């Protein structure tokens, strides 16, 4: 009888877990729609920035010195120190979402150190911070709350510190890593070399959307200011893209957990029915044996 009570208690426990995971799946599904929409709008804005950069590049293409004078295009300088900004979630229960990002960061650290390049880490998200703290790895900066509730202001703060160190010559390169949204059931790691920029990435294109103008400031300053906006939005896009991917991963993880709980309940019900049948059979045998002994 005690065995039956234990099984019944397990069934109740798994059923409660199933209710929780099902509720979390529904919450993640609802949040995913909002995050997906934010990521989509961010992509549109990012494409517009690229378009404007291309137009400006066409306008100033006659000034060959612009690219070489800008501090953001100095790709000939040897790389001795790299800043890695990486984004993870503030919460768990999202499958291998955070693990994939952390693995990518660790692999890049190993590759850079093998080349005698110093690495500094700027961690966005509680899970990444906890992991590297546990490993005893020094983190230059930590940001909690930006990945779970991304805003443009938070993105500005994160990227500004890294870009300032680059322009002041403290670092030679800035890399941004996050796990991005691919579709409802999959995510992909995205590694973006923020600075220095390869000049070939900005293709000069003539369009009719900009009026002819002669700016008061020099062209290098205009390009640098526009690129700063580009850096900020690259960081913001990484945050909203990561959030959409996080909800996608959590929705999938909770769906798998719900299905596993359902299967476990079936197995426990079978075990309960079998144990109950054995118990009834044992009782019947005892009754029959008792009757026989009284004859």
UniProtKB/Swiss-Prot annotation:
The keyword Transit peptide does not apply. One of its GO terms (molecular function) is proton-transporting ATP synthase activity, rotational mechanism. GO terms for biological process: proton motive force-driven plasma membrane ATP synthesis. SUPFAM superfamilies: ATP synthase (F1-ATPase), gamma subunit. The keyword Membrane applies. F-type ATPases have 2 components, CF(1) - the catalytic core - and CF(0) - the membrane proton channel. CF(1) has five subunits: alpha(3), beta(3), gamma(1), delta(1), epsilon(1). CF(0) has three main subunits: a, b and c. InterPro entries: ATP_synth_F1_ATPase_gsu (IPR035968), ATP_synth_F1_gsu (IPR000131). This is ATP synthase gamma chain. Pfam families: ATP-synt. Belongs to the ATPase gamma chain family. PANTHER family: ATP SYNTHASE GAMMA CHAIN, ATP SYNTHASE SUBUNIT GAMMA, MITOCHONDRIAL. Its main location: membrane. It is found in: Cell inner membrane. GO terms for cellular component: plasma membrane; proton-transporting ATP synthase complex. Keywords: ATP synthesis, Cell inner membrane, Cell membrane, CF(1), Hydrogen ion transport, Ion transport, Membrane, Transport. It is a peripheral membrane protein. Produces ATP from ADP in the presence of a proton gradient across the membrane. The gamma chain is believed to be important in regulating ATPase activity and the flow of protons through the CF(0) complex. It comes from the Bacteria.
């Amino acid at each position: 009888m005690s065995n039956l009570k234990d099984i019944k208690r397990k069934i109740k426990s798994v059923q409660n877990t199933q209710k929780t995971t099902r509720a979390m799946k529904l919450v993640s599904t609802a949040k995913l729609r909002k995050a997906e929409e934010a990521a989509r709008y961010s992509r549109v804005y990012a494409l517009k920035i690229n378009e404007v950069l291309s137009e400006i590049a066409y306008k100033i293409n006659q000034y060959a010195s612009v690219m070489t004078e800008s501090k953001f295009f100095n790709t000939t300088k040897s790389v001795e120190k790299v800043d890695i900004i990486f984004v993870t979630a503030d919460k768990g229960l999202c499958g291998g979402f955070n693990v994939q990002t952390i693995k990518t960061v660790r692999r890049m650290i190993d590759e850079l150190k093998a080349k005698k390049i110093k690495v500094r880490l700027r961690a966005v998200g509680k899970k990444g911070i906890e992991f590297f703290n546990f490993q005893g790895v020094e983190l230059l900066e930590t940001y909690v709350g930006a990945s779970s509730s991304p805003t443009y202001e938070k993105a500005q703060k994160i990227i500004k510190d890294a870009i300032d160190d680059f322009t002041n010559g403290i670092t030679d390169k800035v890399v941004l890593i996050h796990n991005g949204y691919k579709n409802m059931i999959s995510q992909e790691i995205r590694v973006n070399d923020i600075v220095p920029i390869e000049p070939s990435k900005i293709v000069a294109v003539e369009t009719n959307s900009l009026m002819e103008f002669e700016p008061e400031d020099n062209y290098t300053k205009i390009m640098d200011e526009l690129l700063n906006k580009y850096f900020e939005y690259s960081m913001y896009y990484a945050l909203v893209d990561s959030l959409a991917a996080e909800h996608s991963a959590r929705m999938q993880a909770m769906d798998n957990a719900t299905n596993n709980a359902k299967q476990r309940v079936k197995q426990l019900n079978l075990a309960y029915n079998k144990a109950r049948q054995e118990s009834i059979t044992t009782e019947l045998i005892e009754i029959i044996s008792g009757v026989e002994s009284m004859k």
